[in-house]
C-alpha cells in the first residue's frame, strides 16, 4: 500500500507500508480487521507528531463528520496473474455524482508521456488523496473488492434497489462466472445489465500502463513505489464534487480508438479518511504543461527558403511584398519584422524601421508607415497578402495567391495575330484558290508601252466594240466560216 501524507507546511512525506506480493487487497480506512496490517506515519507537527496504527474500523460518527475527500486508488496486479494481454493498468478520473469521460490509450504508454496529457489540477485544491493497491484482474478480487465495486457502481450510475449484502459471499472468480440470470436474481434487470456490461469491460479491455498523479514524481525514487509501478497496476482518482465547483470538475480524456468502446469508467470504493491520513496537495507547477514541452517549429527554417526564392525578382525592380519577404528571410531582422508562426503571418515589430528601409531601397527619404500601409492595400485584391484583423501591424502572406500571380502570361500581341500566321491555321489556307479566297496581296497591274491596259479579253474582241484607241485584233483571228454555205 502506498500512501502520501502532507504536513501543514505542505511538504510531501512518504507514508509507505510493505504489502506482500500475495496480498493484493483493496484497502480502506474503514476496512475489515484483516486489513489492519498497514500502518501510516504522520508528519511531525503540533497536531500530528506521533506514529500511530490505523484503526481497522472507524466509527461511523467519526468519518461522517469529516470533510469531503479526494481518494486515489492504485490497483496492482502481478503479470503472471493477469489473463491475456491485460498486463498494464488504467487510469480514469471520476466525479462522484457526475460523469466521467475516458478511453484507453495504447498499451505500454510511458509515465512521462502521460503526464504531458494530464490536465493541470485546480490551483486551490484542498482535497485529500489516498492510494490503495488492488488487483487489476476482476478474477482476483476478494469479497471486499466486489462490495466496493458495487458501492462505486451504485454512485456512478445512479443505480437503485441494489442490495450489496446479497453479494457479500461472492468473490471475483464467482462474480466473473455469473450470467445475466444470476445477476437478475440479486438485483433488478436494469441494474444487472449495467453491472454485467461494466464487468465484461474490465475483463476484456486491455489497460495501458499509466500512473495517476503528481505524488508519483515526489516518490519516484522510492524502491517500493518503483516495485509497484513495474509490477503493473491501475490508478484511479476520485475528486469529491463538494470540493470542486461543477465548472472546474477534473475530467481526464483519452484519444478515441478506431472502435467505439463501452462507457469508459474505472471503479473503486469510496473511503472516508481520518484526519491523520491527509494526503499531499499536488502543486500545479509539478504537472508539466503540454504547450511548454511541445517542440516549437522555427518559422525561419520552414519559410526561409520560400521567402528567399520569392524575394528575388530576377530582372526588374523589386516590389514591396518581395522586399518584406527579403527581410523575413533573415532572422536578424526580427527587431523590425518577424514571422508569427508558420502559416505566413508576420508582424512589423518596428513599422517605422521597415518603412525607412523601404524608402532607402526606393530612394524615397520621406517614406513612412502610413504610405507603406497604403501601398500594402494594393496587394489585398491581388491575393498576395491580407491584413490580420485584431492585431496591429500584422499581415499574412497568401502563398497560393503569390504563386498564381507569378505564373507567366502570354503577350497581348498574340491575341491580335492574323489567323494565317497561327500554326494551326496553316493547312486551312494551303490552297486558297480552291476556296475562291481573294489573295491578301493582289498582283500588280500589267503596263505595256502601247496601252495602259493589257491585251483585251474576248469580251472586247468584237469589231464594233473598239472603245479604246490603238486596239488591234490578235493575228490568229480566223474569218467567219458562214460564207461557204451561202
UniProtKB/Swiss-Prot annotation:
Region (Disordered): 41-62, 79-99, 249-311
GO cellular component, one term: nucleus
Claim: Hydrolase is one of the keywords in the record: no
Name recorded for this polypeptide: Transcriptional regulator ERG
Cross-link annotation Glycyl lysine isopeptide (Lys-Gly) (interchain with G-Cter in SUMO2), location: 289
PANTHER family: ETS, TRANSCRIPTIONAL REGULATOR ERG
Residue stretches making up the PNT domain: 120-206
GO molecular function terms attached to this record: chromatin binding; DNA-binding transcription activator activity, RNA polymerase II-specific; RNA polymerase II cis-regulatory region sequence-specific DNA binding
Amino acid at each position: 500500500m502506498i500512501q502520501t501524507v502532507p504536513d501543514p507546511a505542505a511538504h510531501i512525506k512518504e507514508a509507505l507500508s510493505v504489502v506482500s506480493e500475495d496480498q493484493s487487497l483493496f484497502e480502506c480506512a474503514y476496512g475489515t480487521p484483516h486489513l489492519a496490517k498497514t500502518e501510516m506515519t504522520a508528519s511531525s507537527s503540533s497536531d500530528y507528531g506521533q506514529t500511530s496504527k490505523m484503526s481497522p474500523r472507524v466509527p461511523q460518527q467519526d468519518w461522517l463528520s469529516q470533510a469531503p475527500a479526494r481518494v486515489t486508488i492504485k490497483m496492482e496486479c502481478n503479470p503472471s496473474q493477469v489473463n491475456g494481454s491485460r498486463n498494464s493498468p488504467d487510469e480514469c478520473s471520476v466525479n462522484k455524482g457526475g460523469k466521467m469521460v475516458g478511453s484507453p490509450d495504447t498499451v505500454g504508454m510511458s509515465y512521462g508521456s502521460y503526464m504531458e496529457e494530464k490536465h493541470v489540477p485546480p490551483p486551490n485544491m484542498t482535497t485529500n488523496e489516498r492510494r490503495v493497491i488492488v488487483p487489476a484482474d476482476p478474477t482476483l478480487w476478494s469479497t471486499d473488492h466486489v462490495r466496493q465495486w458495487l458501492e462505486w457502481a451504485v454512485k456512478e450510475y445512479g443505480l437503485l434497489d441494489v442490495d450489496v449484502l446479497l453479494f457479500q459471499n461472492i468473490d471475483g472468480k464467482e462474480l466473473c462466472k455469473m450470467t445475466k440470470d444470476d445477476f437478475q436474481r440479486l438485483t433488478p434487470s436494469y441494474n444487472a445489465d449495467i453491472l454485467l456490461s461494466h464487468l465484461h469491460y474490465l475483463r476484456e479491455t486491455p489497460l495501458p500502463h499509466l500512473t495517476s498523479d503528481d505524488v508519483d514524481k515526489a516518490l519516484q525514487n522510492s524502491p517500493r513505489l518503483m516495485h509497484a509501478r513495474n509490477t503493473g497496476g491501475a490508478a484511479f482518482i476520485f475528486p469529491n464534487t463538494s470540493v470542486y465547483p461543477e465548472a472546474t470538475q477534473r475530467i481526464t480524456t483519452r484519444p478515441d480508438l478506431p472502435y467505439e468502446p463501452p462507457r469508459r469508467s474505472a471503479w473503486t470504493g469510496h473511503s472516508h479518511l481520518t484526519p491523520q491520513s491527509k494526503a499531499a496537495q499536488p502543486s500545479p507547477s509539478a504537472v508539466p504543461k503540454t504547450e511548454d514541452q511541445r517542440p516549437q517549429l522555427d518559422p525561419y527554417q520552414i519559410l526561409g527558403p520560400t521567402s528567399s526564392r520569392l524575394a528575388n525578382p530576377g530582372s526588374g525592380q523589386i516590389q514591396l511584398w518581395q522586399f518584406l519577404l527579403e527581410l523575413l528571410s533573415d532572422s536578424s531582422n526580427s527587431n523590425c519584422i518577424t514571422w508569427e508562426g508558420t502559416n505566413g503571418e508576420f508582424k512589423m515589430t518596428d513599422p517605422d524601421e521597415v518603412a525607412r528601409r523601404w524608402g532607402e531601397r526606393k530612394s524615397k527619404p520621406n517614406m513612412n508607415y502610413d504610405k507603406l500601409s497604403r501601398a500594402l492595400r494594393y496587394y489585398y485584391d491581388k491575393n498576395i497578402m491580407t491584413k490580420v484583423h485584431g492585431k496591429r501591424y500584422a499581415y499574412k502572406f497568401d502563398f497560393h495567391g503569390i504563386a498564381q500571380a507569378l505564373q507567366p502570361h502570354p503577350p497581348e500581341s498574340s491575341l491580335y495575330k492574323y489567323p494565317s500566321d497561327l500554326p494551326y491555321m496553316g493547312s486551312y489556307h494551303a490552297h486558297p484558290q480552291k476556296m475562291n479566297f481573294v489573295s491578301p496581296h493582289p498582283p500588280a497591274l500589267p503596263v505595256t508601252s502601247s496601252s495602259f491596259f493589257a491585251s483585251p479579253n474576248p469580251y472586247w474582241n468584237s469589231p464594233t466594240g473598239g472603245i479604246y484607241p490603238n486596239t488591234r485584233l490578235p493575228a490568229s483571228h480566223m474569218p467567219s466560216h458562214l460564207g461557204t454555205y451561202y
